[in-house]
Structures are given as C-alpha cells and as structure tokens.
Amino acid sequence: MFEKLENLGLDYKNKSAMLEKFMQFFIDYSRKINLISRNDIEFLFEKHIYDSLSFNLFKEKYNIKSGRLLDIGSGGGFPAVPLAVFFDDIDITAADSTEKKIKFLKEAAETLGLKNLHPVCRRAEELPFKAEFDLGSCRAVSELRVILEYALPYLKTGGFFTAYKSLKAEEEIKNAQNALKALNAEVIDRIEYTLPLEETHKRALIIVRKNADTPEIYPRKNGIILKKPL
C-alpha cells in the first residue's frame, strides 16, 4: 500500500519499516484508549497517514527544506508522527491538551526513535512559544478562523501554516477573512488531493502565510476563541 505515497512525491522505501512499526503500535494502543473509530491497518494508512503526508505537496511546492513546526491538536499523532518519520530536518512540537494522548505520543516517539518529535501537554492558547516556529499545521480540530487564532501567534513573521480541510474549504476561507486581517496573515494557496479510499474523498491543504507580527492580545482565552471567533 505504501507505493500510493508516490502520488505525493514521496520516496517511501527507506521509511516503510518505520511506518509499519508505527501503524502496529497505533492499532495496539488504540485498543486501550480509542484513538480512532475504525481500527484496521489499511484504513489507518489511507485515511490518516496518507492524509498527513499530503503535507509534502506543500513542502515541495514551496521548497521547504527544514525548520521548526508546531502541530496544534496532535491527538492520535496526525499529522505529527508521519511528518516526523519522513522529514528528519523538520523539528516538530506536537501540542495537545489531553494527557493520555500526549502519553501515547511520547511512547510513539520513543518506540520509533524519533528525536525530532516533542510532545507537549498544554492548551493551544497557553503555549509559551510566541513567534518561535517557521511552520504550523492542524488537522481535524476546528474551523479555520478558530485554528488560525490558536496557531498564528506562535509562527515567525513569514512563516507558513497548513490547515488540512475538506473541499468545503472555500466557505471556511470566506468566514476566516476577519481572522486573517486581525492576525496579519493571508491565504496564499489551496492544494487539492484525493485520498486513496474506495469512495472518492477529496481534500485540500489551505496554506496561510503570516505577513507581520501578531498583536499581543492573541490568542485570547479558549472560551472566548470558541464563543466569539474572529
């Protein structure tokens, strides 16, 4: 099944053993804490790992060679773990507020020997990393205007944020215009791709660039971010 990663421009041959190890570790662990709803290897790869690694479409297009990446709401490890497996030169901080999921991420990093993966158990709006990261990512957390406020304060000016979205992305982009203006950022690209599932499942990476410093008032407290999104 790993040959499907060639569609994303990835050479998987040197990474297949580590991916297999992670997938089995994930399935075994998920029986304990229910990381995803459907526990089988093929679905895990096609729905979650392949989707996570679509990041390479952005990475190649924008010639990203290295840097520090903050993944917001890493949960069961997507996209953080597959990215850490494939991209040795990207140092990844995986943030999540659920202790049992951070425990899983720490054990996954140790099991796979991932020196470039650093799990952190904190709420996104409470992270102590203002303007420290070159890159950001978020998958399956919230609507775009919400996750932008969670993520952009932690990026350096000129940094890129990648949001994994369905093809309803255009509506989310429209609703995020106030947030983009307030946070001094803009959507610069939308990269579409298709998951290798039996049914057609199209997705999009929304690429956001931070153009200037984020005002100090952001991110606001979590209750405000959710109840009164920008």
For each predicted feature, which ranges?
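Residue-level signal for inorganic ion chemistry
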Residues: F26, L83, K165, V208
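Short alpha-helix immediately C-terminal to the canonical SAM-binding loop
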Residues: K101-K103, A169, I173
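Glycine-centered, small-residue-biased loops immediately flanking beta-strands
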Residues: G159
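Class I SAM-dependent transferase core
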Residues: F2-I64, K100-L117
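Helix-to-beta-strand junctions that scaffold the AdoMet/dcAdoMet cofactor pocket
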Residues: L155-K156
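Short strand-turn motif at the edge of the Rossmann-like AdoMet-binding core
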Residues: Y164-K168, E192
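Conserved SAM/SAH cofactor-binding pocket of Class I
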Residues: E42, L53-S142, L148-E149
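SAM/dcSAM-binding transferase cores
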Residues: K174-L230
